[in-house]
Amino acid sequence: MRSTLLRIVALLGYLFFLSSCAGLDVKLDTAKKSSIKGNRVIIFPFYDPFYRGRQIQGVGEPFATVFTNKLLAAGVSAELPKSREFSSLNMVDIEKACRYAADNGYTMLIIGVVTEWIEGATNWSGTVDVAALSVKVYSSKTCELSASASGRENGTWFTFVNAPTTRFFEPLSEKIVEALLK
């Protein structure tokens, strides 16, 4: 009787563990027309996400900074714009971004949107933390789409530490950069 009860408790614990595991999924959305490797690339601030009809400010710019650092670590010449003309609060105008990139000597540009952002587990709400990012790569001369990739990472159903959703910046950026470089 006691060993049966122990087995049931162990099985339930194992199932609870499996159901609360985190996941990371990244894919190349379009076939690449040209590689970012060997090009001078500018990364515009990623557009801030919306949750329940409200824009969550302050997510897109730090996400773009981490993404830029991952590109640099992969050997890609990448920078953020020096102009404050572009902000994560507004969707980047493609034509304006292409002009800015071409005028400043960049051969490619990356525009991104944080498509999903949920901070839940840190509040013990039973809601899973989620971050999702979609990026598009354009040629600065023609403004033609060269590639696009997206990724989504979700946390566990619970957490034992106060770990904000910003913890997904690094792994999600790294995997999307890997997808763009393949």
Question: In which residue ranges do the predicted regions lie?
Answer:
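Sec-dependent bacterial lipoprotein signal peptides
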Residues: 1-21
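Solvent-exposed loop/turn segments at secondary-structure junctions
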Residues: 48-51, 85-88, 115-119, 153-156
